[in-house]
């Protein structure tokens, strides 16, 4: 199965249901009055952080995700049912981008935190809503709002709690297979692992995910080898295991092998070297390993502890793992406390939608003369109300005209050169201009 850490999807929220015109017809109610119900709200689409998810694989073939529309209103003042919202569980560490501007819209790091991505449209009002002392029998109704339609880019920057890094053939795949459920491909040649391999263990009712990050080589920070594709995955790990092979056949120059990884981390992002890094020397059972270990110790001059193991024979692996997990829990506690102080429980993603809500409408209009007596008029305010108010009743025609008057529509047309009898196109509506 391919590892999916980036995908682009279109999210289409549901439209609001339409309101209706209806009248009470009971024989014992001589002046029945309006009885048209409102439409239900369209379904919204949310992202939900979920610690049980580890990949975006489930979105690989879902290019478009839709929520259902609200139901239309009914007679006897019955409102249409609201559509159910759609909740998409994504792994913690998922970053949501605007694919056009590359702006970060959300950084999902808390389990069960919800992010509103595409908002469903409000239901349209039925004629009962418009009843007033001045209009006891309104022949007015609205269509439901359109749901938001957005495209987002998802990138998984955290695939694991603990990352295992090192040069190719350091023994990372063998190590992760000794204490987790991972079954990576292992062999004695470089780049056996071409995708991150995830393994899971449980401690104190906590699930801890390890990632065998494919081997790094010199120049990885510039994209050489597997480069950027996998360096980004270690940015969000709580700590790193720097695994180095003591086998002279793998690393005849042990100092260069050590510094290659350290330098690549620094070059990619300086703060990576500030993470807790546990240095683990592997293959201690190989000929020449003790000599390489001594060279490494002398070079580090007690500035960093070296944990010595053999992943192949499982020598000292359990002790090393216990120490790593203690560091992990300490780092996780600090991180979660910071998040609680900074973030609310739920967030609404802020972006410019092509379906603005009525309270946020820009009333600016653009008038284009397309022929001698034909004008086309555009604008957010016009687009919104041209959809919401169907011109099928006299009352709705009057209401739509009032919306036009509120933005000095006629005056602006006169200034643009319109005269009586000209055709005015407002999206799907064509009107005859009257001075």
Curated annotation (Swiss-Prot):
EC number in record: 3.6.5.-
**Biological process GO annotation list?**
ribosome biogenesis
Residue numbers binding Mg(2+) = 173, 193
Where this protein primarily resides, as one coarse class? cytoplasm
Domain OCT, by residue range, is: 357-435
Q: Where does GTP bind?
A: 166-173, 191-195, 212-215, 282-285, 310-312
Any one GO molecular-function label of the UniProt entry:
GTPase activity
PROSITE patterns per UniProt = G_OBG (PS51710), GTP1_OBG (PS00905), OBG (PS51883), OCT (PS51881)
Q: Which GO terms describe its cellular component?
A: cytoplasm
SUPFAM superfamilies attached here?
Obg GTP-binding protein C-terminal domain, Obg GTP-binding protein N-terminal domain, P-loop containing nucleoside triphosphate hydrolases
**EC main group:** hydrolase
Domain (OBG-type G) spans 160-329
Asked if the Swiss-Prot or TrEMBL record annotates the protein with the keyword Magnesium, the reply is yes
Q: Cellular location of this protein?
A: Cytoplasm
Q: Does the keyword Flavoprotein apply?
A: no
Q: Which UniProt keywords apply?
A: Cytoplasm, GTP-binding, Hydrolase, Magnesium, Metal-binding, Nucleotide-binding
Positions of the Obg domain: 1-159
Xref: CDD domains: Obg (cd01898)
In which family does this protein belong, per the annotation?
A: Belongs to the TRAFAC class OBG-HflX-like GTPase superfamily. OBG GTPase family.
State how it assembles: Monomer.
HAMAP family xref list: GTPase_Obg (MF_01454)
Primary role: An essential GTPase which binds GTP, GDP and possibly (p)ppGpp with moderate affinity, with high nucleotide exchange rates and a fairly low GTP hydrolysis rate. Plays a role in control of the cell cycle, stress response, ribosome biogenesis and in those bacteria that undergo differentiation, in morphogenesis control.
Q: What is this protein called?
A: GTPase Obg
Q: Which source organism does the UniProt entry give?
A: Ureaplasma parvum serovar 3 (strain ATCC 700970)
Gene symbol here is obg
């Amino acid at each position: 199965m391919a590892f999916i850490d980036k995908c682009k999807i279109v999210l289409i929220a549901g439209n609001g249901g339409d309101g209706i015109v209806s009248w009470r017809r009971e024989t014992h109610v001589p002046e029945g009055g309006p009885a048209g119900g409102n439409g239900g709200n369209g379904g919204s689409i949310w992202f939900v952080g979920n610690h049980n998810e580890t990949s975006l694989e489930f979105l690989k073939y879902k290019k478009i995700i839709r929520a259902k529309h609200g139901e239309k209103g009914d007679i006897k003042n019955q409102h249409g049912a609201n559509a159910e919202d759609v909740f998409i569980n994504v792994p913690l560490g998922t970053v949501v981008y605007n694919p056009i501007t590359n702006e970060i819209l959300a950084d999902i790091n808390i389990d069960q935190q919800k992010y509103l991505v595409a908002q469903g449209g409000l239901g349209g009002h039925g004629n009962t809503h418009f009843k007033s002392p001045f209009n006891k029998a309104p022949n007015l109704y609205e269509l439901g709002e359109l749901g938001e339609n957005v495209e987002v880019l998802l990138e998984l920057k955290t695939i694991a709690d603990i990352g295992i890094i090192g040069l190719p053939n350091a023994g990372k795949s063998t190590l992760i297979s000794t204490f987790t459920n991972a079954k990576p491909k292992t062999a004695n040649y470089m780049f056996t692992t071409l995708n991150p391999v995830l393994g899971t263990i449980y401690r104190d009712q906590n699930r801890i995910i390890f990632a065998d990050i494919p081997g790094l080589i010199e120049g990885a920070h510039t994209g050489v080898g597997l480069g950027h594709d996998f360096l980004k995955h270690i940015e969000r790990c709580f700590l790193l295991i720097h695994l180095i092979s003591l086998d002279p056949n793998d690393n005849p120059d042990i100092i260069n092998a050590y510094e290659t990884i350290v330098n690549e981390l620094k070059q990619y992002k300086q703060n990576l070297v500030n993470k807790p890094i546990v240095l683990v020397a592997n293959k201690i059972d190989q000929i020449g390993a003790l000599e390489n270990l001594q060279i490494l110790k002398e070079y580090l001059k007690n500035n960093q502890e070296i944990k010595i193991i053999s992943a192949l024979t499982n020598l000292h692996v359990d002790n090393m793992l216990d120490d790593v997990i203690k560091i992990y829990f300490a780092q996780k506690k600090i991180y979660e406390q910071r998040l609680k102080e900074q973030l609310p429980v739920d967030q609404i993603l802020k972006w410019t939608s092509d379906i603005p809500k009525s309270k946020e409408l820009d009333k600016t209009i653009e008038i284009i003369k397309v022929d001698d007596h034909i004008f086309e008029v555009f604008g957010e305010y016009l687009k919104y109300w041209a959809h919401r108010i169907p011109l099928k009743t006299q009352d709705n025609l009057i209401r739509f005209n009032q919306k036009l008057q509120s933005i000095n529509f006629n005056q602006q047309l006169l200034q643009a050169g319109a005269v009586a009898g000209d055709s005015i196109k407002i999206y799907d509506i064509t009107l005859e201009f009257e001075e």
